[in-house]
Amino acid sequence: MCDILKHTTMKTGDKIMKKIHRTLSLFTVAAMCTALLCSCGEVPDSSQTDSSSKAATTTTADTTADTTTTGEASSTASATSAPDSSVSDSSSAVTDDTKTNGITPAMWKVTSPEGNTMVMLGSFHALKDECYPLPEAVTNAYNNADILAVECDITSTSEDGEYMKNLMKQMLYNDNTKLSQHISEEAYSALQTYLGYWGMDISALEVYRPWAVSSTLDTLLIQDSDFDTEKGLDNFLLTTAHADGKEIYEVESVDFQMNMLINFSDDIYDLMFRSFEGETKESQKQALEDLYTAWKSGDIETFLEEDNEEELAGYTEEDKKIAEDYNNQMLYDRNKNMAKAAEDLMSQGKNVFYVVGAAHYAGEGGIIDLLEKDGYTAERVQY
């Protein structure tokens, strides 16, 4: 359910499935799942987890920006403080209240072979109060764009009762089987131990399919932190764009992301759950914090650091094949589609602010690499 933090659920330094990236790339969908799980009473509140967790949220975020644009806010209200639920009731655009606010996420000005340009920004789907107001370069990129391109627009789907009802049905087994029958004893044991750190017993999740269990883990992590999906970059920009009447372009869709999570094989989730062995609440919170620190400074390569030989030693060849399948579906195949969408928009001369998860831009096979191989140039924005 979550897509999508690339799960911080990996062992420290264990990146075989690039799980932490999940957290960053599909958290949009995770927000809907969070709401569903909380409505079922399966996600413990702060009294159950001994934490000061925040209430579950229902939306997510991703973002990117440009370097040469300048512009004024398109409406009256100010973004001088972190966005809260009231932002959806305002008609405010993002405003230029600060230069960087100590936040300098990776952002590019991309130019096509024909000379058309686009501003691209790497987002983080759950952020903190300290991220607002947004950096001036980001606000300028938003204010000067005619179109906001995002992975998907969850703001309307999350309020669709029928859609959420159908999604809830897909979270549960309907064949009289249970979780322990679909994953290995090793994976089940690792999950059971990890959930204990959150004051949960795995028996509470036996009726849920692996993708719903995975999302529950992400939900627990976010709720017990300073992060909030409502303050995520995508969610903030989407809410603002709707209020401003700005056109929104979905590179993917909520259905696409949900279907991907739902249809991952049991083998993928088994490997994912096994990676919780040795993990604790604190180690996962620190892993998420480390990713956030990297995002703040524009260090996107950290999201895709490779395993060394020692880290890979504990994995079988079959595990490595499963991890490769996961990474292709979660990251590299989507990168190709995202790059193609960007090229199509630029070929039409559209004035677009293109905001997707930061990990999608990183390294070989990332969006920037794919665009450059097709003859596009990408200039990193200097704040």
Where in this protein do the model-derived segments appear?
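Short, Lys/Arg-enriched N-terminal segments with co-localized hydrophobic residues
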Residues: 1-16
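Sec-dependent N-terminal signal peptides of Gram-positive bacterial secreted proteins and lipoproteins
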Residues: 19-44
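Bacterial lipoprotein signal-peptidase II cleavage site
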Residues: 38-65
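N-terminal low-complexity, Pro/Thr/Ser-rich intrinsically disordered segments
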Residues: 70-110
